[in-house]
Structures are given as structure tokens and as C-alpha cells.
Amino acid sequence: MNTSYSQSNLRHNQILIWLCILSFFSVLNEMVLNVSLPDIANDFNKPPASTNWVNTAFMLTFSIGTAVYGKLSDQLGIKRLLLFGIIINCFGSVIGFVGHSFFSLLIMARFIQGAGAAAFPALVMVVVARYIPKENRGKAFGLIGSIVAMGEGVGPAIGGMIAHYIHWSYLLLIPMITIITVPFLMKLLKKEVRIKGHFDIKGIILMSVGIVFFMLFTTSYSISFLIVSVLSFLIFVKHIRKVTDPFVDPGLGKNIPFMIGVLCGGIIFGTVAGFVSMVPYMMKDVHQLSTAEIGSVIIFPGTMSVIIFGYIGGILVDRRGPLYVLNIGVTFLSVSFLTASFLLETTSWFMTIIIVFVLGGLLFTKTVISTIVSSSLKQQEAGAGMSLLNFTSFLSEGTGIAIVGGLLSIPLLDQRLLPMEVDQSTYLYSNLLLLFSGIIVISWLVTLNVYKHSQRDF
């Protein structure tokens, strides 16, 4: 019996190791190209509005894909979907590397990479829930969370070094490493019984069209894109009210505290994602830093600090309550943006400190938004509601990156608004940092107002 237990325990540990590898490279794929955006812009002679689509394209299919894979896991099985995700991710890597001289091929490759990488976060949690014993799941989730945090931390550093000393196109090949997990996962994961069920393909297509055209509007400001987006969403809303198993539960729309929490959380997450995508442009223009310096010196310390803030945030939520932690997180965010807008021209190390507090504030806010939103859901709404929150979180990051890319390309914002004598290179970034601070404060006030008038005690 001890031998059987040891073999089972060994199998669970092996599964966990390969899941950690997939989780690490999923996050790395998202973060690694961020520091290279200015280099890509120079190579293709493109404005930030276009260049930021390198990340937006990935986040778009990544966010939609996480929801799709989660829905399909029971119908098609985890093994099939993981294999499909890995192959698609690697296929996108090859296309991107081979066609990196063509901007349209690069964007297409990032769409494909996102569609493949989405399988990892969506299915890893399902695998842990199904294969890891209940008494070890907490440790498993904690380990995966730490690996994800490490991926977020080292991603900019790795990206900066490779882009500076070799070429940014080689970053596209990094996800190819995930292919080594295939034979092991196929052997370790059991054969699953497929469950028949309905899949709302029409709903996914309508929502995807609406999202894509809205993002195109945020970077080109073409009214025709906005019209197509609005029409797609209207048809989507009408559609999900008719079908029996819709992609998004329309009943959640009646839960006002939940919807406001998701919306305000999405705005905050998107604002921070947009800020992080702006940092490489800002450091290049204002402080003339290299790509390696931006990744290793400026962004790396901030991304690694999230491990500490995550631990502290969890303790504070339990001891002082979610709204207390939300106030701290929003204060970190708004004050950091406001301070940076006035002191942007100081030493580049100052931005490292700002990023530490921005990402720390984001982590506090994420923890609280999840707590508050889940508390506003009835028991039968919990699964669909939290899935929608995760989907919105990923999607808002891609949207934030797209919107900030569009704002960086507007000449009207490149004017001096602050009553200070500063270099002209700081005008655009200082104005956007002021805007970010205002958005954070407004989202915070709306969230507080809604939950203070709700019937639940948070």
C-alpha cells in the first residue's frame, strides 16, 4: 500500500512540475515583448498605436481563449486541449520568427500565440483540481502562483537582454520550450470521458467581433469601427437571452454590484497594463535607456516585488477587511501616477520605485476586487461570475494596452499642462500619468459608492 501511495504521490508531483513549466511560459509569453515595443516601432517605423498591437493581439485571443478552453474542458478533455494549445502556441512562434520582417505576419503570429497560450491558465487549475489530492491543492496553487509571479518578474529582464544583445525576434521562439512537456503530460494525464454538451459558437464569434472592432476604434478612432462594435454587442446581448447555454450568463447583468465591481476592476487593471506598456517608450524618450536597462533595471524590481505585496495583501484582507486594503491599493496607484507626472524628469531609478508601488497597489486591488465581487454573487452564480471576472481582467489588460497606444499617438496630448519648467520629451507622458491618476480615483469612488449602498456587509 505504501508503494502504491508513493507512486501516486510521485505522479502528482511530476504533473505539478510540468504544469509549473506551462504556467511560467504562459506569463513569460505575455510579458517578454513589452520592453521591446520601442525597438519594434523603430524597425517598422510605426507609431505606438500600431506597435502596441503586438501585445494587444496576444491579450485579445488569450482572454477569449481562457474562457473557451474552460468551457470545453469537460466536452473535449484536458489532454486534447492542452496538446492543441501547446501546438498552436509553438506554431505561432514559428510564424512570428520566420515572418518577423513583416508587421502583418508578426501581429497574426501574436494572435495565434495568444490562442494557444490561453489553454495553460484555463486548464492548469482544472488539472490541479482533478489530479492533485485535496490536502495538497493549497500548496499546488501556491506553487503555481509563485511560478507565475516569477515569470512576470523575469520576463522583462529576459526580454530586454535578448532584444538588446541579439534581436527582439528571438523572443518569439521562447514558447517553443513548452513542447518538451507534451510527452510527459500525455503519459501522466488519464484518458478522460467526453461529456456531450452545447457550445455557444455564435455567441463567441459575436463577442469577439465586437471586442476586436472596439480595440481597432481605440487605436484608429474610426467611427465605422465603433459602429460595427456596438452592433455586434447589441446582437450578442440579444443572442445570449435566447439560447439555453449562452457563453455569458445574461442573469449576471442584473446584479448591479457585481457588474460595477467587474467594470471598475477592469478599468483599474487596464490602466495599469497601459502604464506598463508605456514605460519602455517613456524611458527611451526621456532618459535614453537601452532595452536591456529598461527590462533589468527599471521593470524587473517592480515585477518581483509583487510576491511580497501579495503576501501582505492577503494578511491585511483577513485582518482589516477588503475595503481597507482597496483604499491602500488605490492610494498607492493614484499617488504613484501623480508623483511620477511631476517628477518624471528626475533620475531613471525613480521610475523603478514608482513601478514597485504601482504593481503593489495593483495586487492589493486585484485581491480586493476578487473578494468583493465574489461576495456579491449568489451560490449558483459563483462559477459563471468568477469566470467572467477572470475573462474581463485579461481582456481589460489588452484593451488598456491598445488605448494607451492610441493616446501616445495623439499630438494634442503632447502639450505642456503642468506649471513647471520641464523638458519637452516629458509633456506627453506627464499628461497621461495625470490622466491615469484621475481614472483610478474615479473608479475607486464609484466602487465605494456602490458597495456602501449594497445590502451586503463587506
Curated annotation (Swiss-Prot):
Subcellular location as annotated: Cell membrane
Annotated GO biological process: proton transmembrane transport; response to antibiotic
Principal localisation: membrane
UniProt keywords, alphabetically: Antibiotic resistance, Antiport, Cell membrane, Hydrogen ion transport, Ion transport, Membrane, Plasmid, Transmembrane, Transmembrane helix, Transport
CDD domains referenced in this protein's UniProt entry, alphabetically: MFS_MMR_MDR_like
Gene Ontology MF terms in the entry: antiporter activity
Record field: transmembrane: 12-33, 81-100, 111-129, 140-162, 165-185, 201-221, 223-240, 256-276, 297-317, 324-344, 346-365, 432-451
Membrane topology: Multi-pass membrane protein
GO cellular component: plasma membrane
UniProt cross-references to Gene3D superfamilies, sorted A to Z: MFS general substrate transporter like domains, Multidrug resistance protein D
Free-text function comment from the UniProt entry: Resistance to tetracycline by an active tetracycline efflux. This is an energy-dependent process that decreases the accumulation of the antibiotic in whole cells. This protein functions as a metal-tetracycline/H(+) antiporter.
Similarity comment text for this entry: Belongs to the major facilitator superfamily. TCR/Tet family.
NCBIfam families, sorted: tet_MFS_L (NF012185), tet_MFS_L_K_45 (NF012175)
Name the record gives this protein: Tetracycline resistance protein
Gene: tet
